[in-house]
Structure formats: C-alpha cells, structure tokens
Amino acid sequence: MKFGAIYEEYLREQQDKYLTKCSHVEYKRLKKVLKKCRVGRSLQEDCPNGDQQEGNNESPDICKCNSCTLCDQMFFTELTKEASEIAGCFSSRVQRLLNLHVPSGFLRYIWRVRQCFIDDQQIMVQEGRMLLNYVTMNAIAIRKILKKYDKIHGSVSGRDFKSKMQTDHIELLQSPWLIELGAFHLNCNSSDIDETVGFLKNEFFKNFSCDLTEARPLMTMAISETMKYEYSLTCPICLDTLFNPYALSCGHLFCKGCACGAASVYIFQGVKSAPPEAKCPVCRSDGVFAHAVHMTELDLLIKTRSKDYWRQRLREERNEMVKQSKEYWDSQAMLSMGI
C-alpha cells in the first residue's frame, strides 16, 4: 500500500480519537497542487511557441512558467502553516501529558490520591504512543511531499525548505518535546504494558531505545528497519552526559549548570533568568533562554539508568551552588556597605 493511502486511512481513524482536533498535513491537497504544476509543464513542452492563444485559455491553477510562482506560493505557504500548527499542537499535548506523569506541588498530592483508586499508567502510555505516531506520520508526509516537489521541479527547494523548518524550530523530528516523549516512553517501561488495545494498525512509530553506556550516549527512535533518528545526550559544553537538562528555544540541550554558566547567571537563579541578549553557545541565537524547557522525563531516565553518575553530578552541582551563593551574598554585602 502506498503512503498516500496509508495516510488517508490514518486520518480516517483519527476522526473520533484523541487527536481529532489536531492539525494534519493536507497531503492529498498538496499533491494536487504539484500535479497541476506537472500538467502545466507537460503542456509547455508539447507547445513551446505556437500556441500562445491556447495558453491564454488555460486554467489559472496550472503552473505556466519555470519559476512556478503560483505553485510555490500555494505549496510552501500552506506547508509552513500546517507544520507550525502541528508543532504547536504536538508540544502542547506532550506538555499536558508529561505534567500528569511528573506532577509538582499540590497536583502531585492529588495525583497520588487518584492512583489509589485508578491506575492511569496504560492510558497515558497509549496517549504517548498516539502522539508519537501523530508526529511521525506528519513528519513522513512532509518529507515525502518535499521530495516529490524537488522531483517535479528538478530543484533543491524542498531540501532548502527542510533547512528553513529547522531554523524556524518547526522541524517535527528535531523537537525537544519528542525527546521528552521518548524518555517518557522508556520510563514507563511500555514494552511490559498491553499495547494492543486502541492503537493504529498503520502505525509508523516502532520503538525508542537509549544507550548511556557508550562514549557517545544516544537516544534512538526507530521508524522502520531502515529509517532511524539519533538524538545526542551529550552536553555541548561539558562534553559529558546531560544532567538536569534544559532545552533552549532553539532546540539545543544543555546541563542546567552549563546553560547558566553560558548565560552568565548563577545556577540558583535558573536558566530563565538569563538576560535577553544571551546567546545559545551552539547556534548563537539570542532570546532563547526565556522559554527554556526543563527536560524532567529525560533527567528521570538518566537518573534511573546511570544512578552513580547522576548522584556524582548532583553532589558537584550542589557544591557549586553553595559556592556561587556565598559569592553572590558576599558581593551583595559589599555593595550594601559601599565597599
């Protein structure tokens, strides 16, 4: 079965399910735009010079020039809008799910009381897999439609658009929330839970795995036997496995202490207290600290699988926080005394 048919069946299955209000890639409609462009190009090649009058009577929907201005406007504008909506929907749904799994404050108390009566573990795992399948299906749809665009036009505009999506932080398979959801999937030991009920028969997402024992710790998402995505769990600053990780708005991950050091703020002040002009140490984007995300599920995964390493880093961070706190209050005391 071709991907287009699989994708349409997936959309039909989602009409009455958890993701019914989420945006999806209009794969069929975008294919029609490219098909019109292909027809227009064929007509141009068959009638290079002599049929000006016939060309004037053609439908305005058919792409009639090599630059494909109309096609590009319809295609890339629509795809950008859809990718942005999907990324926003995915991040909000994942955030809501993970807040239930690792609650804080009064919500944690309510959640523990609720667990005495109802075990929501399997429901949460099912929702997690639905979200993984949702983002995977749409990411593959975007990749295939861009590949088809480049094939029809003999260009690299589709490939360039993928790079632009990464720059605009709407590349679905590079989202920090996908890493968080993968960590949640591993933390729940979902392979031991009955996953046969309520899942899609056309499920593209296969599995997440994590290896922290190698010199380069990785999390791997398998979509198929041949398609796998790897996510580095190494901090770009200390070059060690991430500890108490934070994801900046640009998508890059750092240890909390490393991110605070890069932004010239104290650890106890937090990553979000960084000044607006602070730049990401990797991509040099500014304004990326204000909306940084604490990767609680990833931190829990590393804590569970590398207990000795996590305890050692915790001691080191606490010692550094005590040292920085002393420096801060000493400087405040000197300022108050006018020294």
UniProtKB/Swiss-Prot annotation:
Similarity field: Belongs to the RING-type zinc finger family.
Entry domain remark: The RING-type zinc finger domain mediates binding to an E2 ubiquitin-conjugating enzyme.
Entry keyword set: Metal-binding, Transferase, Ubl conjugation pathway, Zinc, Zinc-finger
Enzyme Commission code(s) on record: 2.3.2.27
PROSITE patterns: SPX, ZF_RING_1, ZF_RING_2
One record GO biological process: protein ubiquitination
Disulfide bonds: none
Catalytic activity, as annotated: S-ubiquitinyl-[E2 ubiquitin-conjugating enzyme]-L-cysteine + [acceptor protein]-L-lysine = [E2 ubiquitin-conjugating enzyme]-L-cysteine + N(6)-ubiquitinyl-[acceptor protein]-L-lysine
SMART domains: RING
Domain spans labelled SPX: 1-163
InterPro entries: BAH1 (IPR033326), SPX_dom (IPR004331), Znf-RING_euk (IPR027370), Znf_RING (IPR001841), Znf_RING/FYVE/PHD (IPR013083), Znf_RING_CS (IPR017907)
Pfam families referenced in this protein's UniProt entry, alphabetically: zf-RING_UBOX
MF terms (GO), sorted A to Z: transferase activity; zinc ion binding
UniProt pathway annotation: Protein modification; protein ubiquitination
CDD domains: RING-HC_BAH1-like (cd23127), SPX_BAH1-like (cd14482)
Protein name according to UniProt: Probable E3 ubiquitin-protein ligase BAH1-like 1
Zinc finger (RING-type): 235-284
Keyword Translocase assigned: no
Domain of life: Eukaryota
